Curated annotation (Swiss-Prot):
Disulfide bonds: none annotated. Keywords: Cytoplasm, DNA-binding. Belongs to the YbaB/EbfC family. It is found in: Cytoplasm, Nucleoid. Binds to DNA and alters its conformation. May be involved in regulation of gene expression, nucleoid organization and DNA protection. GO terms for molecular function: DNA binding. It comes from the Bacteria. This is Nucleoid-associated protein CBU_0656. Its main location: cytoplasm. It holds the Pfam family YbaB_DNA_bd.
Amino acid sequence: MIGGKFNLGSLMKNAKKIQEMMQKAQDELAKIRVTGESGAGMVKLTMTAQHEVVEMNLDDELLKESKEVIEDLIKAALNDANQKILKITQEKMMSAGSLFGGNESDNEET
C-alpha cells in the first residue's frame, strides 16, 4: 500500500509479467527432449518434457533376456528420463519464479 492506497495497477502489471514468463518457460519445456537409459545403454528412450515417449531403442542382445528383465530395464529407463525432466522443469520454473524474489541458486544441486 502506498499512501494508504493499494496499487492495483502495479499488482496487475507484475502478475501479467509473471504469467508471461511462466508461459515462456512452459513453451521452452515443450521443445525439450531427454534420453533415459538403463542396462548400460541396452535400453534408451527419448521423452519430451511433457512425458511423451517419442523414441525407444532396445539392444538386440537384450531380447535374449527374460520378459521380466526387459520390463525392469524399460521401467528404469523411464524413471531415468522422468528424473531428468523433473530437474529441468524445476530449473526452468525457478528461473521464471525468480520474479517472486527467490534466488534460484539457493536450490541448485552441487
